[in-house]
């Protein structure tokens, strides 16, 4: 899809690059992406001790990548467009400070409520959060999205931070223009790309772990949900 870098997968408007996003994004043309939906490492040094199938998350132990990665994300995103990024609340200051410093404007905050409770020392987590970030002044959506979205767990989990497709669908519907291109530079197991395929959108994913690239390809091979 982009010159000088061979995709791991490229079919029917969906491309996957097996690489660090900082190695691939410089090859993307400026202002070539209509919307970014991503779930980057939370900087909490995650270890999946409770499930041997789920690996540690690359880049989760340090923050040096945050500024250069989001600077590239900002560059490739079109003017007057949105980036929706999940983040880890223990280091919200790093994420929010970085986003503002490179030009993003936080315009809304979204909470995703799980039916199942997580673990915790002081409180048991039941939600995850994302910022809606604007580059420039995007047009208002035809119908504003609710800032609290409930989700069920996925029937099969491939990644420790995997987001259900039902959490991605309303974001695509509200913030991605028709026939737009969606970017997920921290693709994981490919939920953003799978959801984009269901909506008939073009999408690009970047993932540093080859195993997750293969999982995403397998998920893309399944029948589309909508027709």
Describe each PLM feature range.
Residues 1-214:
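Core catalytic lobe of class I
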Residues 204, 213-227:
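C-terminal helical cap(s) of enzyme catalytic domains, especially alpha/beta-barrels
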């Amino acid at each position: 899809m982009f010159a000088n870098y061979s995709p791991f997968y490229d079919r029917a408007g969906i491309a996957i690059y097996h690489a660090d996003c900082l190695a691939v994004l410089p090859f993307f043309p400026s202002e070539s992406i209509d919307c970014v939906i991503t779930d980057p490492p939370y900087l909490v040094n995650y270890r999946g001790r409770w499930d041997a199938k789920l690996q540690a998350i690359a880049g989760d132990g340090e923050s040096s990548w945050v500024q250069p990665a989001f600077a590239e994300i900002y560059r490739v995103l079109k003017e007057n467009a949105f980036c929706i990024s999940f983040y880890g609340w223990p280091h919200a200051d790093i994420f929010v400070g970085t986003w503002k410093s490179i030009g993003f404007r936080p315009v809304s905050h979204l909470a995703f409520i799980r039916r199942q409770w997580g673990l915790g020392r002081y409180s048991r987590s039941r939600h995850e959060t994302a910022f809606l970030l604007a580059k420039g002044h995007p047009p208002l959506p035809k119908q504003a999205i609710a800032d609290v979205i409930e989700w069920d767990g996925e029937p099969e989990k491939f990644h420790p931070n995997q987001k259900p497709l039902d959490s991605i669908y309303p974001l695509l519907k509200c913030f991605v223009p028709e026939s737009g291109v969606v970017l997920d530079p921290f693709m994981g197991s490919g939920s953003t790309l799978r959801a984009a395929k269901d909506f008939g959108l073009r999408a690009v994913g970047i993932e540093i772990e080859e195993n997750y690239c293969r999982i995403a390809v397998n998920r893309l091979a399944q029948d589309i949900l909508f027709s």
